[in-house]
Design a protein with these regions (language model features):
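Short helix/turn-capping signatures at newly exposed starts of structured segments
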Residues: 25-42, 61, 69-71, 77-170, ...
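Coil-to-beta-strand transition motifs
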Residues: 142-147, 186, 196-200
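Bacterial Sec-dependent N-terminal signal peptides
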Residues: 1-42
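Short, exposed beta-strand-loop hairpins at the edges of beta-sheets
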Residues: 77, 192-198
Length: 259
């Protein structure tokens, strides 16, 4: 199945923009074994036949062999038996931002209590990041969370793997240097927006409800403008590595590996 082409059924609003190495199991209520895998791993079902999976993005089944292909959850069944399949990522660059849409600002602050709050206004929270996340950003409408963002200068091959393990490619826009994704459940949209500061290619990864895709893109641009002085200062201080790559080349390379 061509998973990219299958997205022709997406709403026009979105399209217009653009051998197991580790496996665990536990019993569910029906006595079946639930399975947890990592992307790229395989697992052989010990008994039964005619197995199928209800989400072909998360896993593929050939005979009795499951291959995990995308982070998410699915149900594997053969008409008489079933079990839950959970696929976890292999590549972890940062902790996922808080993504409970419509949460209050106080709820986000509680969830981010271990991170340093950098700046705050009525519609926005920005935190210093950890690991490969330089910053986290949260945007609010009428006091409710509608978009979460991660700002990163880490655009090595691992970044490609990070995206590919978690998200389904929808499309891209060369003019705005953006790549659009969704998750396995198709409940939220992910936008990778590329830019350049002090000759350093930079990316903002924005997460939000699929219905907010248009306003998300504008919000990401706004948050980037607010953070630009902090990012530039980090580059001058040597906290962010300076590279020679052109941002358009970086974006094109990442997009090619995702197809």
């Amino acid at each position: 199945m061509n998973k990219f082409l299958k997205w022709a059924v997406l709403p026009t609003m979105i399209l217009g923009l653009f051998t197991v190495t580790s496996c665990s199991s536990d019993d569910d209520d029906s006595g079946q074994k639930n399975v947890t895998m990592k992307v790229g791993d395989t697992y052989t079902i010990k008994s039964g036949s005619n197995w199928s999976v209800d989400n072909e993005y998360v896993a593929e089944i050939t005979g009795s062999t499951i291959k995990a292909t995308l982070v998410g959850e699915a149900t594997v069944s053969n008409g008489t038996s079933s079990f839950k399949l959970t696929v976890d990522p292999k590549t972890i660059l940062w902790k996922d931002p808080y993504m409970k849409w419509n949460a209050s600002k106080s709820q986000v602050k509680t969830a981010m209590s271990k991170y340093e709050l950098l700046t705050e206004n009525d519609d926005q929270l920005i935190y210093n990041g950890k690991d490969k996340a330089d910053y986290y950003g949260y945007q609010f409408q009428n006091g409710k969370l509608y978009s979460s963002m991660v700002f990163t200068s880490y655009l090595e091959d691992e970044f490609n793997d990070f995206l590919k393990e978690r998200f389904i490619l929808i499309g891209s826009n060369d003019e705005t240097l953006t790549i659009y994704f969704t998750d396995y459940s198709m409940k939220y949209i992910v936008i990778a927006m590329f830019t350049e500061i002090e000759d350093v290619p930079y990316c903002i990864v924005g997460y939000g409800d699929a219905s907010e895709v248009n306003s998300m893109a504008q919000t990401m641009k706004s948050e980037f403008i607010n953070l630009k002085p902090y990012i530039a200062e980090s580059i001058k201080n040597g906290d962010i590595k300076v590279g020679n790559a052109n941002v358009r080349e970086v974006k094109a390379k990442i997009l090619e590996t995702l197809k």
